[in-house]
A protein has these predicted regions:
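Flexible "cap/lid" subdomain of the alpha/beta-hydrolase fold that forms the substrate-access gate
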Residues: 2-28, 35-186
Length: 186
């Protein structure tokens, strides 16, 4: 799963920023992008001068504190890490059903996503390679990414960090978000 690790994605992003002529920059990310941004700040501290993460707690903490509420709310974390081709086969059988179910689970109002945006998600999730890549991202999170995080225990980010979360979101209700991020950042 190494090619789908947050470290590999961070390296790709760093290469893009270097190619664009940016040796230092701010980065912000939400959800999976927040996890990549966190890894980018860890692996390239000379480049990332400010970090913002939205609606996430540190990955290892989320796995380490899993309970029934978390497992129910984030069931896809545990479904998508199952060995291939199990989740890929189930999703590809009816990608529209999978996406509609996820959108309903994640949001209170289906109108929050436009029909055009949903159609683009469906177009992408009708491609077996996209489904596999999505599963591999989660498999990496539950394996090699946790190894990378474990190697960083005790090493705190020393850059300005902005953490934002929704008042009614699962992570905001389950975790003391400021305390959670103080464990990994100054």
């Amino acid at each position: 799963h190494a090619v789908y690790s947050k470290r590999a994605m961070a390296a790709d992003m760093m290469a893009v920023m270097t190619e664009l002529g940016h040796s230092q920059f701010f980065i912000a990310g939400h959800d999976r992008g927040g996890r990549v941004a966190h890894r980018l700040a860890r692996d390239y501290p000379q480049a990332v001068t400010k970090l913002a993460v939205l609606d996430i707690a540190p990955t290892a903490m989320m796995y380490d504190t899993t309970d029934m509420h978390f497992a129910t709310s984030y069931y896809h974390w545990f479904f998508l890490i199952q060995p291939a081709p199990f989740p890929e086969t189930l999703i590809s059988h009816d990608p529209k059903f999978f996406l509609e179910s996820k959108m309903q689970h994640w949001g209170k109002d289906r109108s929050a996503i436009t029909n055009d945006a949903f159609d683009e998600y469906l177009r992408c999730f009708s491609n077996p390679d996209t489904i596999h890549a999505s599963c591999e991202d989660y498999r990496a999170s539950a394996s090699i990414d946790l190894e990378h995080d474990a190697a960083d225990v005790g090493l705190k980010l020393d850059i300005p960090l902005l953490v934002l979360w929704g008042a009614t979101a699962m992570v905001g209700n389950k975790y003391d978000m400021l305390a959670a991020w103080r464990e990994v950042a100054v």
